[in-house]
């Protein structure tokens, strides 16, 4: 039976939006366990509102009406123009923004609730001035309770809070900005952004318990709490899902970085914000008893909010609050001491293997006072670190525990986990090994046992094989998924991160990676450079602090004849950029790579990534003034120029090549060319000549001074004799 014909544009619009009802309700593809949890957190969010939680529930959402066809068409065109950002200058864009705001006056609530036009409001917020943000805040005032619960308007509220937060800090630092009303409306009432935020919180605080588990409002509430606390909100945030849905569409402006990622620096906030935050935390704790708080711990939407409240409570108001009976942490874990058989013990044991609850347990371990953490660790985890590390979910809890252990406890935990390394590698659970390595290095714990286990597990016919840890096969076809795309699996990413951590260690552990990379065939090295995940390890190896000249020379020479094609590859081009830094002390090899780039000039200039490599290697200067490029290249590559292998320096054959170079440099037995020896000899002669000249000048000054003193004493003697005669 033929399928129903659907318009391509509408289908593409739905795919781009990622926020419509059909996308959420559609049956998702079979994913990993963690991804299923994220999907369930959206699909089942409303179901949890029927849990027996004693909260004040708001009424039905207000309907604000719809835009007519002409208005929708205008705002869609305006959205496209802002997205393309093809204005002559900022002034032209500001005039356009003003005209759009004028057209939207009185229709802001309709636009925010519109599936097709709410994106326009988000882009307007990204480019708005403080006065325009305040005006929009005032238009939303009194309607925030409805807006934060709406599928589309909630995104506008998030954007408004994020981009209005710096204005609060600006007004705090420069109070004079509040003295003059906006020039566009001299009769406008002056209101601070601080007051607007406090009005918003006052509007929502009666329904906080309900909003914590609302599928849309929970995200907005968490952003509002971060703004009130003054905490940073960075795009590198590991716990991004705590604040923002993974399905959130990125709305940005072409040619700018604004809006592509949420970035909010740590900033001072008014005292009223911290007071409001404390009041909110206390209200949340008083609204919910121990049973309901523990229910939120496994709630897909309530859990992230509970994590944030717990973290802010302990970070901003002191870890002594753990003793306060009305605090969130004390209500969740009221037993003192927390021992087996208590309700608190049952609660903790229930969180360890729960895909949602374990995230709250990680936050408790990370933020709890030292006394409480030690009590929890010794009672529940001290003898179980090995078994915890094996589990897919509990392994992340074990990682957080390792980050807080002292040297003695860490050494004991390390010995438990080392025994599980073969099992961990077999199950692709290498993230915990990476964390263990990092903590042992930080605490100065002996890592020889870890090194021995890793060497045994990843060894092949030719000894340690880095391709095993990077999950790269000699056959390129095996490195692709069934759909033909590169494999970006978490297991492969974790393997690359583990290899990079090993290279950061100066000694036998790092030597495993360096020596294995140096033994790769040119074909496999090129394949490694083209792999988006494994190439990160190669970049780190070429720029590593402990990478020797010998290793870098061997590694870079494997790319000879392939530099042009690698510079055109999105992943391998970054390796070619790293070669620039990797040729420090190898000026001749740097020039050899530049020659290959010059031979492929036309193809490089036609490619986006190729042009980036051309620019980073300063190839325009190479083409115009090669002599100047060579001089600069030799200067930045080091004064030693090309360094040869120390083949007859008497090093033991058991010493790895890149360690031999390090030992040779320590003895000062570095090979020097004839011209360098001549320069050194000339410099030594010049220093000797200056010393002799300085000594001569000093001697002459001393003789002159002695002569002057003798004349003065002679004249004084004559004067004295004359007086006696008289």
UniProtKB/Swiss-Prot annotation:
Residues 1-52, 640-726 are annotated as: Disordered. One of its GO terms (molecular function) is RNA binding. InterPro entries: ARM-like (IPR011989), ARM-type_fold (IPR016024), NOP9 (IPR040000), Pumilio_RNA-bd_rpt (IPR001313). GO terms for cellular component: 90S preribosome; nucleolus; preribosome, small subunit precursor. GO terms for biological process: endonucleolytic cleavage in 5'-ETS of tricistronic rRNA transcript (SSU-rRNA, 5.8S rRNA, LSU-rRNA); endonucleolytic cleavage in ITS1 to separate SSU-rRNA from 5.8S rRNA and LSU-rRNA from tricistronic rRNA transcript (SSU-rRNA, 5.8S rRNA, LSU-rRNA); endonucleolytic cleavage to generate mature 5'-end of SSU-rRNA from (SSU-rRNA, 5.8S rRNA, LSU-rRNA); ribosomal small subunit export from nucleus. Residues 640-667 have a biased composition (Polar residues). Keywords: Nucleus, Repeat, Ribosome biogenesis, rRNA processing. It comes from the Eukaryota. Pumilio repeats lie at residues 103-138, 139-174, 203-244, 343-378, 379-419, 519-557, 558-595. It is found in: Nucleus, Nucleolus. Residues 10-35, 685-700, 706-726 have a biased composition (Basic and acidic residues). RNA-binding nucleolar protein required for pre-rRNA processing. Involved in production of 18S rRNA and assembly of small ribosomal subunit. Belongs to the NOP9 family. This is Nucleolar protein 9. It comes from Phaeosphaeria nodorum (strain SN15 / ATCC MYA-4574 / FGSC 10173). The lineage of its organism: Eukaryota, Fungi, Dikarya, Ascomycota, Pezizomycotina. The gene is NOP9.
């Amino acid at each position: 039976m033929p399928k129903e014909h659907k318009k391509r544009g509408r289908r593409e619009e739905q795919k781009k939006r990622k926020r419509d009802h059909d996308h959420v309700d559609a049956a998702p593809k079979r994913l990993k366990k963690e991804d299923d949890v994220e999907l369930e957190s959206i699909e089942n969010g409303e179901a949890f509102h029927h849990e027996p939680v004693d909260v004040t529930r708001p009424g039905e959402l207000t309907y604000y009406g719809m835009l007519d066809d002409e208005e929708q068409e205008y705002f869609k065109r305006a959205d496209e123009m802002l997205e393309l950002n093809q204005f002559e200058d900022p002034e032209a864009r500001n005039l356009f923004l003003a005209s759009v705001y004028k057209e939207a006056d009185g229709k802001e609530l309709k636009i925010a609730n519109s599936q097709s036009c709410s994106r326009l409001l988000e882009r307007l917020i990204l480019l708005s001035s403080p006065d325009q943000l305040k005006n929009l805040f005032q238009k939303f005032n009194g309607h925030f309770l409805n807006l934060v619960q709406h599928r589309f308007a909630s995104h506008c509220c998030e954007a408004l809070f994020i981009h209005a937060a710096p204005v609060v800090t600006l007004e705090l630092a420069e109070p004079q900005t509040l003295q003059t009303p906006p020039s566009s409306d001299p009769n406008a009432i002056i209101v601070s952004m601080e007051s607007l935020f406090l009005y918003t919180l006052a509007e929502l605080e009666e329904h906080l318990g309900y909003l914590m588990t609302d599928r849309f409002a929970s995200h907005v509430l968490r952003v509002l709490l971060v703004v009130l606390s003054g905490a940073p909100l960075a795009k590198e945030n590991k716990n991004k899902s705590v604040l923002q849905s993974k399905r959130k569409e990125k709305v940005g402006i072409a040619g700018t970085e604004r809006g592509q990622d949420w970035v909010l620096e740590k900033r001072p906030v008014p005292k009223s914000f911290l007071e409001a935050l404390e009041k909110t935390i206390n209200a949340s704790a008083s609204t919910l008893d121990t049973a309901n708080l523990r229910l939120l711990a496994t709630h897909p939407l309530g859990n992230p909010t509970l994590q944030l409240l717990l973290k802010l409570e302990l970070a901003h108001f002191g870890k002594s609050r753990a003793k306060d009976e009305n605090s969130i942490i004390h209500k969740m874990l009221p037993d003192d001491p927390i021992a087996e058989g208590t309700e608190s013990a049952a609660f903790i044991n229930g969180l360890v293997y729960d895909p949602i609850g374990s995230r709250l347990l990680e936050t408790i371990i990370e933020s709890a006072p030292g006394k409480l953490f030690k009590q929890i660790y010794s009672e529940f985890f001290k003898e179980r670190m090995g078994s915890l590390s094996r589990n897919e979910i509990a392994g992340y809890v074990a990682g957080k525990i390792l980050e807080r252990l002292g040297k003695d406890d860490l050494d004991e935990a390390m010995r438990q986990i080392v025994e599980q390394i073969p099992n961990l590698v077999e199950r692709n659970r290498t993230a915990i090994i990476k964390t263990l390595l990092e903590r042992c290095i930080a605490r100065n714990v002996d890592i020889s046992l870890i090194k021995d286990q890793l060497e045994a597990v990843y060894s092949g016919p030719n000894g340690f094989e880095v391709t095993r840890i990077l999950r790269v096969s000699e056959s390129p076809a095996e490195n692709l998924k069934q759909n033909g795309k590169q494999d970006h699996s978490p297991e492969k990413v974790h393997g690359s991160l583990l290899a990079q951590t090993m290279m950061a260690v100066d000694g036998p552990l790092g030597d495993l990676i360096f020596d294995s990379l140096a033994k790769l065939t040119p074909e496999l090295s090129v394949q490694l450079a083209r792999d988006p995940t494994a190439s990160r390890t190669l970049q780190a190896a070429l720029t590593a602090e402990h990478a020797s000249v010998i290793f870098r020379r061997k590694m870079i020479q494997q790319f000879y004849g392939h530099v042009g094609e690698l510079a055109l590859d999105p992943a391998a081009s970054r390796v070619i950029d790293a070669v620039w830094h990797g040729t420090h002390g190898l000026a001749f090899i740097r020039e050899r790579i530049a020659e290959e780039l010059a031979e492929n000039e036309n193809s490089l200039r036609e490619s986006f990534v190729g042009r980036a490599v051309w620019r980073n290697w300063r190839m325009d200067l190479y083409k115009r003034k090669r002599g100047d490029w060579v001089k600069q290249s030799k200067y930045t590559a080091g004064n030693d120029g090309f360094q040869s292998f120390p083949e007859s320096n008497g090093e033991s054959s058991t010493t790895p090549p890149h360690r031999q170079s390090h030992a040779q440099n320590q003895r000062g037995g570095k090979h020097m060319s004839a011209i360098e020896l001549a320069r050194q000899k000339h410099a030594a002669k010049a220093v000797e000549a200056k010393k002799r000249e300085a000594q001569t000048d000093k001697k002459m000054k001393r003789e002159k001074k002695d002569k002057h003193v003798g004349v003065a004493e002679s004249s004084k003697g004559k004067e004295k004799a004359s007086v006696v005669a008289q």
